[in-house]
């Protein structure tokens, strides 16, 4: 999967197209990501110890990974991802537009 937790992404398709957000969680087996402030849904929750009031809660729902693109740290625009092996043998992701290494 080309995105990881903590990456900043832009949404390519759907009702939140064009919005930017940070990846909160990645689910590789389901090919989905949870993005901060994107795909908000209302859930009905029962009163519990954590939420004694209960009621309707707004939260993020996961979207398919193909509907997001990583944002290039240099230009701030959407970019594709490539992989390369550094001299020390570490495999890292890099932005195709700028060549900037994304993994530390």
From Swiss-Prot:
Keywords: Ribonucleoprotein, Ribosomal protein, RNA-binding, rRNA-binding
Gene3D superfamilies noted in UniProt: 2.30.30.30
GO biological process: translation
Family matches, as CDD domains: KOW_RPL26 (cd06089)
Molecular function per GO: rRNA binding; structural constituent of ribosome
GO cellular component, one term: ribonucleoprotein complex
Entries under NCBIfam families matching the protein: rplX_bact
Family designation: Belongs to the universal ribosomal protein uL24 family.
Subunit structure: Part of the 50S ribosomal subunit.
Record function comment: One of two assembly initiator proteins, it binds directly to the 5'-end of the 23S rRNA, where it nucleates assembly of the 50S subunit. One of the proteins that surrounds the polypeptide exit tunnel on the outside of the subunit.
Stored HAMAP family: Ribosomal_uL24_B
Protein name: Large ribosomal subunit protein uL24
Source organism per UniProt: Brevibacillus brevis (strain 47 / JCM 6285 / NBRC 100599)
Organism taxonomic ancestry: Bacteria, Bacillati, Bacillota, Bacilli, Bacillales
